[in-house]
Amino acid sequence: ATPESSGSYGFVRLEGDLLRTEVAGMSLTTGVYGAAGHSSVDVKDDDGSRAGTVRDDAGSLGGYLNLVHTSSGLWADIVAQGTRHSMKASSDNNDFRARGRGWQGSLETGLPFSITDNLMLEPQLQYTWQGLSLDDGQDNAGYVKFGHGSAQHVRAGFRLGSHNDMTFGEGTSSRDTLRDSTKHGVSELPVNWWVQPSVIRTFSSRGDMSMGTAAAGSNMTFSPSRNGTSLDLQAGLEARVRENITLGVQAGYAH
């Protein structure tokens, strides 16, 4: 039998556009964002019993470049991000904590279609390359030394959501602007909802890890692999509060 895991996550993000211009029939937008999030993964043993839980609290800073073809709506999103992690693994009243740093680069594209005046469907394709370095740590059972890990992912899916006074044809990092720079009441804010189911294929995952106890000769080194296919479901709400500021909340489930 093979151990199984399932997890969930949620985060909030604040982003702002720095430059918006038109180039050769395309709309170009660049900007920066900050995010804070929490994820939790439950691990089951071979017999289906609970083996432990891994939690991660993270804060991120990143930048984005968005290109939209004016006539067709086809878009491409390029994102670069750095993240600080605070992780905790719990099992049988034993806790292990570690801090670390991560990075991520992403290229995403999509093409929106109108179903109704206020409902859009958008097929999407995304490539992601990410890396993570964690500090060494120990718990009651022994020590763990982490190396640098990295992995690549390809995501295929679609986004279904409302279209309320906000351009839908963009990726996860940028949004079009409104004519009015400020809304004066909550009821006036353009708020959109969306759901995004996807299939994710992970490949070229690398990373060495060693662990052991104080006993001589107990050290073991192995290279866990994350290669495989997973299902992902995300949902969120977004509101434009100023001409170049979007507030959003997002949650997801992966298996």
Predicted regions and their residues:
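Membrane translocator/pore-forming domains, dominated by Gram-negative outer-membrane beta-barrels
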Residues: 2-255
